[in-house]
Design a protein with these regions (language model features):
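N-terminal low-complexity, intrinsically disordered patches enriched in charged
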Residues: 11, 21-23, 113, 238
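Short, positively charged and aromatic/hydrophobic N-terminal segments
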Residues: 18, 23-41
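Alpha-helical structural elements
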Residues: 11-13, 20, 49, 57
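Gly/Gly-Pro- and Ser/Thr-rich, intrinsically disordered tail segments characteristic of DNA damage-repair
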Residues: 34-310
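A ubiquitous, low-specificity "background" feature that marks scattered single residues
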Residues: 10, 19, 27-29, 64, ...
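Residue-level detector of alpha-helical transmembrane segments in integral membrane proteins
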Residues: 1-2, 6, 22, 26
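Positively charged N-terminal leader segments that act as targeting/secretion signals
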Residues: 4-16, 31
Length: 310
């Protein structure tokens, strides 16, 4: 705890403290240093009790993973897209497996774009193959890596929304083994938030350990892996999952878990670009902010201090 000597008008209010570990500024209505320290420690302890911890879980390429599992295939090794081919090649792909994304194919592209990209990849593979010839094809990422003479192929799976809902319900029931329904916020068919503040003492686990245990149980029972974010509020949990987790290596099960609090968010993401990577910041908002010279979350924070009218 550090005592700051501030201008007289502020000091008249009492003794001013900054608690470095908790990042809390406190002005106390006491006049003695001893009583101020006691009071500060009490306030910090109460603040800790009020601090929440949230986990955000996103099932990895959910629709595509379900289709892989139903075909007895590994979702992390199979090239597959979920799209209704009957609607022409301009139909939007609802999901793309991670292995196919690794070739530069977007997760929500149109089917003709996927086919064009695959043609480009196969042209490059043909050029590099022995005798400039491709012999056969494969949908397996591992096989394609080890056998350069094979052409990249992929499966087009028609969407089955009712079936995905059944899978989602099964996974939600796994969540309920660990967290009460009132502490779960269902964000979409493949994504949830959990307030896990009160469960650490119950399970004797950290937030990361609890997230990993839940994800591995889902993987064991359904074959579907996930990414998780941990934060001190919903926004930070979501951003940890959407932004930070994408930049860390997955483990052997394809799991990525990232954490953020207010301090690490400021330290690591205030200069991150583009703004559209952040939850609820679309292209429209981003373009309006850019018109005012605002390009990062740090810019937004600084602008908020000096331009309240905005």
């Amino acid at each position: 705890i550090r005592l700051y000597f501030l201008p007289r008008p502020v000091r008249r209010q009492g003794i001013f403290f900054y608690h470095k570990d908790e990042n809390i500024f406190i002005i106390l209505q006491t006049r003695t240093l001893k009583s101020a320290i006691i009071e500060t420690k009490t306030i910090v302890k109460e603040e800790k009790k009020l601090q929440r911890t949230y986990i955000s879980i996103d099932l990895k390429s959910f629709y595509a993973s379900v289709e892989c599992r139903e075909r007895g295939l590994d979702p992390l090794d199979t090239n597959l897209v979920v799209a209704d081919e009957r609607r022409t090649d301009k139909t939007i792909c609802l999901a793309v497996t991670p292995s196919l994304k690794s070739y530069g194919i977007p997760g929500r592209g149109r089917l003709f774009e996927v086919k064009q990209r695959v043609q480009q990849i196969n042209a490059a593979r043909r050029f590099a193959a022995p005798g400039r010839q491709l012999c056969g094809s494969s949908c397996s990422y591992a096989q394609l890596q080890s056998e350069p003479q094979l052409a990249l192929d992929f499966i087009i799976a028609p969407p089955r929304m009712a079936y995905y809902m059944e899978y989602s319900t099964r996974i939600y029931e796994i969540y309920l083994r660990y967290v009460a329904p009132e502490d779960i916020i269902v964000y979409s068919v493949d994504e949830v938030f959990m307030d896990v503040t009160q469960y650490f003492e119950l399970y004797g686990l950290t937030a990361r350990e609890l997230a990993m245990r839940i994800i591995l149980e889902v993987l064991r029972e359904t074959g579907i892996t996930a990414t998780a974010g941990i934060g001190t509020n919903l926004f930070l949990a979501k951003v940890a999952m959407d932004v930070r987790a994408k930049h860390i290596a997955a483990d052997a099960n394809g799991v990525r878990i990232a954490e953020l609090d207010e301090q690490s968010y400021r330290r690591e993401l205030w200069q991150h670009r583009p703004l559209t990577d952040f939850w609820r910041v679309g292209r429209g908002y981003a373009s309006k902010l850019e018109a005012r010279g605002i390009y990062t979350m740090g810019d937004i924070a600084r602008c908020s201090v000096y331009n309240e009218e905005l």
